[in-house]
A protein has these predicted regions:
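Generic N-terminal amphipathic, Lys/Arg-enriched alpha-helix
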Residues: 3-14
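Histidine-centered active-site/metal-ligand motif
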Residues: 47, 67, 79, 130-134
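Acidic, metal-coordinating catalytic segment for phosphate/diphosphate chemistry
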Residues: 12-51
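Active-site segment of metal-dependent pyrophosphate-handling enzymes
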Residues: 100-136
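Conserved Nudix-box catalytic region and its N-terminal flanking loop in Nudix hydrolases
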Residues: 60-104
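Short acidic (Asp/Glu) patches
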Residues: 34-38, 48, 87, 117-125
Length: 136
């Protein structure tokens, strides 16, 4: 993933309030300061992840997945991988890996960012990971 592509998408994102503006700024700072902002080994402060919001055709139901390590129901998503050329590729790969969905109709065909979040991830000693943040 080319950081300049994500930077352009983040700069085009319209924050929804003060918290959103702060998170947008922190994401841009991570892109500007980290040599590997997409690497899951980047734990200080963290790294970028990508997720999808999946609705049924009537837009009445939302797909959530139980995250076993965290014990939370979350939208499908995960870490960037080396072969991910852009945000859309990462989202579609994660969606396929986690749900088995291979064909989806994008409501947002340009894959523009419509929501951002920075959330804390607790240490996972079994993976040798300390606490960090996901910039999603």
């Amino acid at each position: 993933m080319n950081p300049s592509v994500l930077r352009s998408q983040l700069e085009a994102y319209l924050p929804q309030g003060t918290r959103d503006r702060r998170q947008q700024q922190r994401m841009l700072e991570l892109l500007n300061s980290s040599a590997q902002p997409f690497s899951r080994s980047n734990l200080s402060p963290g790294h970028f992840t990508a997720s999808a919001l999946v609705l049924d055709p009537s837009a009445e139901r939302l797909l959530l997945i139980l995250h076993r390590s965290l014990g939370l129901w979350l939208q499908p998503g995960g870490h960037f991988e080396n072969g991910d050329e852009n945000l859309e590729a990462a989202v579609l790969r994660e969606l396929s890996e986690e749900t088995g969905l291979l064909q989806v109709e994008a409501l947002n065909p340009d894959c523009q960012i419509f929501d951002i979040d920075i959330h804390n991830i607790p240490a996972n000693p079994s993976k040798g990971e300390g606490p960090h943040q996901h910039f999603d």
